[in-house]
Amino acid sequence: MESGPRVEPGPGAPAAVLARIPQEPRPSPEGDPSPPPPPTPMSALVPDTPPDTPPAMKNASTPQQLPLEPVSPTGQVSPQPAPPPDECPSSEAKSRGPTPTATGPRDAKPSQRSSQPSPTAVPASDSPSAKQDVKKAGERHKLAKERREERAKYLAAKKAVWLEKEEKAKALREKQLQERRRRLEEQRLKAEQRRAALEERQRQKLEKNKERYEAAIQRSVKKTWAEIRQQRWSWAGALHHNSPGRKTSGSRCSVSAVNLPKHVDSIINKRLSKSSATLWNSPSRNRSLQLSAWESSIVDRLMTPTLSFLARSRSAVTLPRNGRDQGRGSGPGRRPTRARAGASLAPGPHPDRTHPSAAVPVCPRSASASPLTPCSAPRSAHRCTPSGERPERRKPGAGGSPALVRRRLEATPVQKKEKKDKERENEKEKSALARERNLKKRQSLPASIRPRISTGAELSTKSKARPTSPSTTWHRPASPCPSPGPGHTLPPKPPSPRGTTASPKGRIRRKEEAKESPSPSGPEDKNHSKSRTAEEKEPAAPASPAPSPVPSPTPAQPQKEQSSTQIPPDTAVPAVPTVPTFPTAPPTAAPSVTPSKPMAGTTDREEATRLLAEKRRQAREQREREEQERKLQAERDKRMREEQLAREAEARAEREAEARRREEQEAREKAQAEQEEQERLQKQKEEAEARSREEAERQRLEREKHFQKEEQERQERRKRLEEIMKRTRKSEAAETKKQDGKETMANNSGPDPVKAVETRPSGLQKDSMQKEELAPQEPQWSLPSKEMPGSLVNGLQPLPAHQENGFPAKGTAGDKSLGRAAEGLLPFAEADAFLKKAVVQPPQVTEVL
C-alpha cells in the first residue's frame, strides 16, 4: 500500500493511461476517509453473470462511472448521463435485458478510486454516481436472487411433475403385469381342466374297452365250456368197463363212425375259433402283441389239452388187449414211435399243472366234472409212462390170447403190400389236394386279401389236421370187444391205412402250410404264423400216438413214418395224377379167414375192416370224382370266361375300328365340305370383283361421254357467242363511222375550226379500233374491249362513253342516238337472251379405280 496520495490522470490523459488505471493496487478500506458500502461477495455475484457474456457487455457501464474521462477518440462510446434515481428498477432491468452487464468487482473499482481525493477531480461530483452504482448493484442482486428462486421453484415443480408421471407409469406397469399374470393363471387353469377332462375320458374309454374285452372273452369261454361239456358227456358217457352201456358201445360207435370225422372237425374248429382265435384277433392284440397276465392265463388254459380231448385222441384203448399185445409183439420197431409219442406228450404248455391222481399235463378245468376220470386216468398214466415200463404194464394181457397173436403173425404179405400202397396213395393225394387248394385260394383272391385269408386258411387247415387221429381211432372200435371166453376167437384185423398215416400227414401238411402261407404276407405275418404253429403243435401232440397200436411185422414201416415226419419244409411232395389206380385186395382172403362170420356183420373184425376200407375207397373215389368234376367245371368256366373275354375284346376292337372309320369318314367329309366352301367363297369373290370392275368401267365410260357432251355444248356456245360478238362489232363500227362522218361534216360547216379538229378522230384511234376488230374474240367470261367496257348487260348494249343518258355530248340530234340504240338491239331479235344460254359447268369429279 502506498502512503502518499495517488495521482490520477487529468482530463487530457490518453486512453492507454486510462486503461492502465484499474490495474493499480487498491487502497484498503481502512485508509479511505469516506469508505463506500462493502461490496457484495464474489460468490453472490458470479452466478448472476452468465459465462458467455462478452467483455464489452461487462464493461458497458465503465464510461458512466468515470465522468472525468474525455470522449474516446475512435470506437469509444461517449459518456451518457446516468438515469435519474427515481427510475423504476424494473424498467432498468427490462432495458438491460435478462443478463447483467457488469460484475461486482469491476463496478467497485471506480467507486473506490472516486472516493479518494485527487487534485484535479471535484469531490462532490463522484458521490452521486457511486450511490447510483451501489443502488444498481443491489437491484441486480435482488433480481438475480428472484430469478434463482423462480428457477428453483420451476425445477421443483418440474421434478414434482416428473415424479408424478413416474408414479403413474409405475402403477400402470404394475397393473399390466398383474393383468398378464391373471390371464396366464386363467389359461393354465383352463389347460389343466382340459387335460384332466381328456384324461378322464381316456380312462373311461379304457375301462369300457376293458369291460367289453372281458365280456367278450367270458362269453367265448362260457360258450366253449358249454359246447365242450355237452360233447364230452355225449362222447364219453359209456366208456366205463363195468357200466351197463358197455354192451351197446360197440354198436353206437359203429353207427356213428361214418359221420364222426365231420362232427369232430366242426367241434374242434368251433372250440379253437371261439377261444384262441378270439384272443388272437381281439382289438387288444391289434394294439400290442404282448398279452396281459390274465389274457395269457386264459390262453394257456384254453390251449392246454383236456381229459376229454386226450380220451378222444386215445380211443384206441377201447381195442381188445390182444390187439395191444399183438402191437407189442410186432417187434422193437414200434418202440421208437411210442417213445416219440410219449415224449411229445410229456412237454405240455404248463408241466406243473398236473392232475392230483394222474401224471398227465391236463387242464385242471376238466379234472372235476369229467366222467372220464375213473377210466382215463390210468390209461393216460399208461400212455405217458416211459418206454421201459410198458412191457410190465402189458404182460398180464399177453398170455391171455395166444391164438390171436399167432393169427396176426400169419397175416398175408398181400395185405401188407396193399396197406403200404394205400398209405402212399393217401399221403400223396392229400398233400396234392392241400397244395392245390391253397394255390386256388391264393389265385382266386386279390392281393390285398391274401395275407389275411392265408392266415385264416392256415388256422383252418391246422385245426382240421389235428383231429385226424381221433377221427381214425373212432373207426377202430367198430367191432365190439371180445369176451374173455376161450372158444371165441376172431380173425386178425388188417390195420387201417388212414390211421397209420394220419399223424405224419398232419405234420407234413402243417409244415407245408407254414412254408407257403407266410410268403404273401409280411414279416409280421411270418412271426405270427410261426408262433401260432408252435402253440398249436403243443395241444396237437396227443394226437400223434394214435397209430401206435397198429402192428407191423418189420421195422421198415416205422422208419418210413419217422422219415416222413422229418421231411424238411423245403422238400416238395411229388404230385399225383388226377385219377390214380387203386390196388384191390384179393376176394378170396376174406372167406378163407372168416368161416364163422355172423349175418349182422358187426361182430367180425375182418368184415368190418373190409366194409370200412370199401367205404373209404368209395369216399375217396367220390372225392376224386368230385375233384375231377370241379377241375373240369373250373376249366370249362375258365374257357368260357376266356372265350367271353375274347369275344368282348373282339367286339370292343370292332367297335373301336368302326368308330375310327366313322371318325375318318367324318373328317374326310368335313375336309371336303370345307374345301367346297372355300372354292365357293373364292368364286363369289372373283365374281364380285369382276362385277365391280365392269361397273367401274361403265361409270368411267358414262363420265367420258358426259364430258364429251359437255365439251361439245361448250364449243357450240362459244361459236354462237363469237358470231354474236362479230355482228355486234360490225354494227358498232358502221355506226361509229357514220357518226364520225356526220360530226366531221358538222365541224367543217361550223365557225370554230378548233372544235372540228378536236372532234375528228385521230388516226391512232382508228388503228386501234381496227386492231380490236381483227383480234379474236375471248370466251363468254372474258372482259370486253376498252372501247366497250360494258358491251352486254342483260342483253342490252350500253351507250357509248361520249353519250350520256342516250344523248350525245354536244346533243345536236337526239333522234339519231335513239336510232343507234335501236340498231344496237337488233342482233338479239333473232336469238334468246344471253343469260338463258349460260350453262353452269358441273364440278370435275375424279374417280379413283
Curated annotation (Swiss-Prot):
One Gene Ontology CC term in the entry? microtubule cytoskeleton
InterPro entries, A to Z? MAP7_domain-containing, MAP7_fam
Task: Name residues in a coiled coil.
Answer: 167-223, 602-724
Indicate where this protein is primarily found: cytoplasm
At which residues is the cross-link Glycyl lysine isopeptide (Lys-Gly) (interchain with G-Cter in SUMO2) found? 462
* Amino acid composition bias (Polar residues), ranges on this chain: 457-474
Q: Note down the stretches annotated as region Disordered.
A: 1-151, 186-210, 318-815
Report the subcellular localization. Cytoplasm, Cytoskeleton, Spindle; Cytoplasm, Cytoskeleton; Cytoplasm, Cytoskeleton, Microtubule organizing center, Centrosome; Midbody
Belongs to which family?
Answer: Belongs to the MAP7 family.
The record describes the protein's role as: Microtubule-stabilizing protein involved in the control of cell motility and neurite outgrowth. Facilitate microtubule stabilization through the maintenance of acetylated stable microtubules.
Q: What name goes with this protein?
A: MAP7 domain-containing protein 1
Which species does this protein come from?
A: Rattus norvegicus
